[in-house]
From Swiss-Prot:
Chief subcellular location: cytoplasm
Catalytic residues in the record: 96, 157, 185
Entry EC no(s): 4.1.2.4
Protein name: Deoxyribose-phosphate aldolase
Cytoplasm as UniProt keyword: yes
Organism: Gloeothece citriformis (strain PCC 7424)
Name of the gene this protein is made from: deoC
Localisation: Cytoplasm
Catalytic activity: 2-deoxy-D-ribose 5-phosphate = D-glyceraldehyde 3-phosphate + acetaldehyde
Signal peptide residues on this chain, from the entry's feature table: none
Pfam families reported in the protein's UniProt record: DeoC (PF01791)
Disordered: annotated segments: 209-231
Pathway assignment: Carbohydrate degradation; 2-deoxy-D-ribose 1-phosphate degradation; D-glyceraldehyde 3-phosphate and acetaldehyde from 2-deoxy-alpha-D-ribose 1-phosphate: step 2/2
Length: 231
């Protein structure tokens, strides 16, 4: 398959995700092969798959991102830190960390700060803090964004995809709050190139999706390919 400049331009934003609970080693092989084929910069996977992914992507330009505390964010800070350290030791270079939403709702800002800061400081990796914007008020979104930026997160990620996907409105809101201080990752429910490009236009620097290959194929033959069903 030959990729055009426009294909590669969209591909450069995609974190190619394999985050279904039933994912097999064979599916991970396919995910990594697709990331390499389509020039996606990152695969986003569960910690259990990091070692295999690092081996599969040896000498490739694709980075490995592990999700931490995913998808609920309700494990202890000690557990999240251990999970993050182990992912780093196994070769992950990025971490998508789910914040504790219960703490946010209860006003426990310091607990959230300490948790994210400890992961950032002790691993030294690129950390994307997942906010789950679909279950937050605008006030809570702003507070969560400010806490995670102060704690050292490099990106704010809209959602896990388990409770609704990214919206243009939320990406714009986070862009306004962050003022370019950190990146924004739009994630979940991205099914068409038009949607992907609209999220980028709104301010997204990364797109988290399992549909990356389909997005590129739709760009190549938009009249022949129907939007796929989301996972």
């Amino acid at each position: 398959m030959t990729l055009t400049d426009s294909d590669i331009e969209l591909a450069a934003y995609i974190d190619h995700a394999l985050l279904i609970p039933t994912a097999t080693p064979q599916q991970l092989e396919q995910c990594c092969a697709e990331a390499d084929q389509f020039h996606f910069p990152t695969v986003c996977i569960y910690p259990v798959a990091v070692k295999q992914a690092v081996q599969l992507l040896h000498n490739k330009k694709v980075r490995v991102c592990a999700v931490i505390g995913f998808p609920a964010g309700a494990t202890t800070s000690t557990t999240k830190l251990y999970e993050a350290r182990e992912a780093a030791e196994n070769g992950a270079t990025e971490l998508d960390v789910m914040i504790n939403l219960g703490w946010l709702k209860a006003g426990k800002s310091e607990d959230i700060y300490r948790e994210i800061a400890s992961i950032c400081e002790e691993t030294g990796l690129t950390v994307k803090a997942i906010l789950e914007t679909n279950v937050l008020t605008d006030t809570e979104k702003r507070l969560a964004a400010e806490i995670c930026m102060d704690a050292g997160a490099s990106y704010l990620k809209t959602s896990t995809g388990w409770f609704g996907g990214a919206t243009i409105a939320d990406v714009r809101f986070l862009k306004q709050v962050t003022k370019g201080q950190v990146g924004i990752k739009a994630s979940g429910g991205i099914r068409t190139p038009e949607q992907a490009l609209a999220l980028i236009e709104a301010g997204a620097n990364r797109l988290g999706t399992s549909k990356g290959p389909d997005l590129i194929r739709q760009l190549q033959s938009p009249r022949e390919t129907k939007p796929p069903e989301d996972q």
